[in-house]
Amino acid sequence: MNRVVYVQPDFPVDAFAGTATYYARYRVPYPAGLLKDLITRAGLTGAGRLLDLACGPGRVALALASSFQEIWAIDLEPEMIVVGQHEATQRGVHNITWMVGKAEELAAPPASFVLITIGEAFHRLDQQRVAQHTLQWLQPGGCLAILGGYGPWSGTEPWQRLVAAIVRHWTSHHAAHGAVAAQPQPGSGPDHNERVLRATGFVEVASYPFVVPHDWTIDTLIGNLYSTSFCSKRVLGDNAAAFEAELKAALLAHDPSGTYSEQMRFGYTIGRKPS
């Protein structure tokens, strides 16, 4: 059945408060092969304008900065924008306009972007509204790309199941604030995203997976978890130290090497505005 069930987001406005520095440092970058593939499929030439919706600290905007004359990057969390601006300055990137606000409420002129990206955020947005807006904002032949990746708690390695169980325990029973559930969620994933794009009027809709090897340490795992809305230091509150201690002890008991390997799954769904 191909009926589209649009997500009506219920994430708190401050769901990512306090996560921006962890996000910039500990989220694994999108694979170079994925970005190169996106550039090729979108037909980017180094000209035109990119819009990065729900941009976080600018992981997509910064990675694609050299492929555009101008970039708009918008996120609801002010700390994300501050960290993104700092990262841009450190990298010598000066073609990004940073904005604080909701993707759903952005006022953008029609037919003004050659590519619009949404990285690991489409499940948190009003999908029907955002998809319709992006179709209006794109130039004819321009593309919308929804990028995503799976966190270290979502894989099938034994150590990942261990991490998931500990995270679930602490965020279900000990959280200082209401924890936001981890993916997968209704209204997320490539198949769903494809249905949304087709229903909106995009053509040439397809999804492309990328798998890359990655080695975690205990510190980078904890930093990555602190970059999430459901296991941030703010969510854990005074229990953060106890959470860290239990996670470290469990991982070292499982594998005392302190290195934990996985095949990380990334991907993107792309659709083109009819010419």
Question: Predicted segments — roles?
Answer:
Residues 135-212:
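Conserved catalytic/acceptor-binding region of the Class I
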